[in-house]
C-alpha cells in the first residue's frame, strides 16, 4: 500500500511537468509562427501599381464603399469568411482590426481613388499562405480581379519567400476558378469546406509554385 501511494505521489508531479513542457512548446511554436508570418507580411510591398489598379492597405475612408459593395448576397454566397448581411461594424472591424493582424495581409483594390474590392493573404499556423479576394459586382467581367491577383502573387514571388500559395474556391464558382487559372494556379485536390458559407460544400484547392527563375 505504501508503494502504491508513493507511485501515485510521484505520478502527479511528473504529469504536471509534462503538461507544463507541452504547453511551453506550444507557446514557443505559436510565437515562432507569429514571427515568421510577420516577416512574410512585412516583406510584401505596401503599394502595388498595375496598368489600371492600385493595391494598397485598407483605410477608414474605405468603409462606405466596403459597406456598399460587400453587403451583397451575390458575393457573400461564394466566400467563407464574409459576413452577410455586411454591416458598418463589419467594415470598420475589417479596416481597424483584421487588416492590422499579423496573420492577415489584405489590400484594397482601387480604381482611381475608389475601392472596388479586396485581395490578400492569410497566414494560418502550419499552412502555406492562402490567397483570398472579392470584387464588387459593378466591376465584374472587366478583368480587374485577374489583374489584381496576378500583381499580388508576382509581388509575393519577388520576395523569394512565397514558395507555394494556396487558394480555395467553391467547386461551382467557375468565375473565381478562371481568375486563378489565368494567374497560373493549378488544381491540387478536392475537399470539403470547413467554415462559414463553404462548410460542408465541395471546394477545389489550387496552388501556385514560385517560378524557378524568380
Predicted regions and their residues:
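Acyl-donor (CoA/ACP) binding surface of acyl/acetyltransferases
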Residues: 1-77, 106-214
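Generic alpha-helical scaffold signal
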Residues: 60, 85-89, 103
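Conserved GNAT-fold acetyl-CoA-binding loop/helix
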Residues: 74-96
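Short coil/turn residues that cap or connect secondary-structure elements
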Residues: 83, 99, 120-123
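A generic membrane alpha-helix/interface feature
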Residues: 90-92, 98, 179, 202
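Short loop/turn motifs at secondary-structure junctions and domain boundaries
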Residues: 97-103
Amino acid at each position: 500500500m505504501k508503494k502504491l501511494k508513493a507511485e501515485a505521489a510521484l505520478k502527479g508531479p511528473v504529469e504536471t511537468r509534462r503538461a507544463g513542457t507541452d504547453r511551453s512548446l506550444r507557446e514557443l511554436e505559436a510565437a515562432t509562427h507569429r514571427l515568421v508570418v510577420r516577416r512574410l507580411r512585412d516583406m510584401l510591398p505596401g503599394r502595388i501599381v498595375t496598368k489600371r489598379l492600385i493595391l494598397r492597405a485598407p483605410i477608414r475612408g474605405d468603409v462606405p464603399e466596403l459597406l456598399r459593395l460587400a453587403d451583397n448576397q451575390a458575393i457573400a454566397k461564394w466566400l467563407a469568411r464574409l459576413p452577410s448581411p455586411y454591416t458598418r461594424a463589419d467594415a470598420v472591424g475589417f479596416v481597424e482590426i483584421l487588416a492590422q493582424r499579423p496573420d492577415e495581409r489584405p489590400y484594397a483594390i482601387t480604381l482611381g481613388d475608389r475601392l472596388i474590392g479586396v485581395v490578400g493573404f492569410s497566414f494560418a499556423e502550419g499552412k502555406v499562405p492562402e490567397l483570398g479576394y472579392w470584387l464588387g459586382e459593378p466591376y465584374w467581367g472587366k478583368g480587374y480581379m485577374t489583374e489584381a491577383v496576378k500583381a499580388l502573387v508576382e509581388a509575393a514571388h519577388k520576395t523569394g519567400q512565397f514558395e507555394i500559395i494556396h487558394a480555395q474556391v467553391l467547386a461551382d464558382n467557375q468565375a473565381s476558378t478562371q481568375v486563378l487559372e489565368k494567374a497560373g494556379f493549378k488544381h491540387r485536390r478536392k475537399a470539403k469546406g470547413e467554415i462559414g458559407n463553404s462548410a460542408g460544400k465541395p471546394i477545389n484547392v489550387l496552388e501556385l509554385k514560385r517560378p524557378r527563375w524568380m
